Amino acid sequence: PFTFHDKDGKLTGFDVEIIEKVAQKLGWKVEFKETAWDGMYAGLNAKRFDVIANQTNPSPERLKKYDYSAPYNYSAGVIVTKADNDSIKSFPDLKGKKSAQSATSNWSKDARDNGAIIVTVDSLAQNLGAVKQGRVDATVNDKLAVLDYFKKQPNSGLKIAVESDKKIPTGFA
């Protein structure tokens, strides 16, 4: 898990710990500002913060505007459906289906490019909740994040229906 709250409500995770170590080495003080996914780049543009450390993926459009760290991870996208949904076996099967997505994520673009009807939500939890509640047919998201969710919610009633062959890099912006 890259960013999450521990049992005491403290922000932690791989991204948090790496940024804290880098800041410590440079003698900087770190203040984390939690922001909805779709507002992260706007916050960077407005100089509300100096870096995005939340499993960000450089897209060609983003690389034109932002500097990124070297990738520290590569992850595939997955389509998550209800466990009893067998209608989605490939990315093209998303055509005409509702998919819960964060508006600005790379995975949202993949869902849209495959003909999904995008229902915009703010977070992975909302994506998966919308699938679980039957408000949407699927969500396309990062495999590692989904596997972490399944580890914490083994009886979620959801499944990974499809895994992408494409792996995208993750870094800090």
Where do the model's predicted regions map?
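Alpha-to-beta junction loops
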Residues: G27-K29, N45-N54, K97, Q133-A145, ...
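Acidic, polar ligand-binding/catalytic clefts
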Residues: V16, E20, Q24, K29-D93, ...
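Short, hydrophobic alpha-helical packing/hinge segments within bilobed ligand-binding/sensory domains
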Residues: I18-I19, M40-G43, W107, N127-A130, ...
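Short glycine-rich His-centered loop
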Residues: P1-G13
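Short loop->beta-strand "edge-of-pocket" segments that line small-molecule binding or catalytic clefts
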Residues: P1, F91-T104
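Periplasmic-binding protein-like
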Residues: N73-T81, K143, L147-A173
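Short beta-strand-to-loop elements that line the ligand-binding cleft
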Residues: K29-A36, Q101, A116-L124, A130
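Short loop/helix-cap segments at secondary-structure boundaries that form the rim of catalytic
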Residues: L44, L63, S108-N114, K151-K152
